[in-house]
Amino acid sequence: KESAAAKFERQHMDPSTSSASSSNYCNQMMQSRKMTQDRCKPVNTFVHESLADVQAVCFQKNVACKNGQSNCYQSNSAMHITDCRESGNSKYPNCVYKATQAEKHIIVACEGNPYVPVHFDASV
């Protein structure tokens, strides 16, 4: 079974591109990363930074998660991200996404040993 840490990497990590290269980026990535298999995942964020830099966030600023849990952490520096949001004409299995690029601080939930990101909570 896929671990929570591996799932985070699959759903949120894209260090090889510095930003969404094309308008088709989200459509391709959401599909290739298997987030459109049984439904269209409505919103997803990809982080264009090294895995080491994102894992390091677990040891940065401790903040409350959206769900009230206390194991979330905010990055000290802004990171290159792409938000993929389902567009109005999207209907499973033909999921259609709109990409928005930004440089924002990310907030992730961390757990385990080693202590690594398992959930993308927000960007600010």
Curated annotation (Swiss-Prot):
- Biased-composition ranges, Basic and acidic residues, are 1-13
Q: Where in the cell is it found?
A: Secreted
Q: What is its EC number?
A: 4.6.1.18
Cellular component annotations (GO), alphabetically ordered: extracellular region
Q: Which GO biological process entries does UniProt record here?
A: defense response to Gram-positive bacterium
Which residues are substrate-binding?
K7, R10, K41, P42, V43, N44, T45, K66, R85
Residues annotated as signal peptide:
none
Q: Which PROSITE patterns match?
A: RNASE_PANCREATIC
Annotated catalysed reactions: an [RNA] containing cytidine + H2O = an [RNA]-3'-cytidine-3'-phosphate + a 5'-hydroxy-ribonucleotide-3'-[RNA]; an [RNA] containing uridine + H2O = an [RNA]-3'-uridine-3'-phosphate + a 5'-hydroxy-ribonucleotide-3'-[RNA]
Instruction: List, from the UniProt record, the residues annotated as the active site of this protein.
Output: H12, H119
- InterPro entries in the cross-refs: RNaseA, RNaseA-like_dom_sf, RNaseA_AS, RNaseA_domain
For this UniProt record, the keywords arranged alphabetically read as follows: Disulfide bond, Endonuclease, Hydrolase, Lyase, Nuclease, Secreted
Cystine residue pairs? C26-C84, C40-C95, C58-C110, C65-C72
Nuclease as a keyword?
yes
Name the enzyme group at the top EC level: lyase
Superkingdom, taxonomy of origin: Eukaryota
Instruction: Cite the residue spans of the region called Disordered.
Output: 1-24
PANTHER family on file = RIBONUCLEASE, RIBONUCLEASE PANCREATIC
Summary of the function given for this chain in its UniProt record: Endonuclease that catalyzes the cleavage of RNA on the 3' side of pyrimidine nucleotides. Acts on single-stranded and double-stranded RNA.
What family is it from? Belongs to the pancreatic ribonuclease family.
**Oligomeric and partner information:** Monomer. Interacts with and forms tight 1:1 complexes with RNH1. Dimerization of two such complexes may occur. Interaction with RNH1 inhibits this protein.
Q: What is this protein called?
A: Ribonuclease pancreatic
* Organism (species): Cervus elaphus (Red deer)
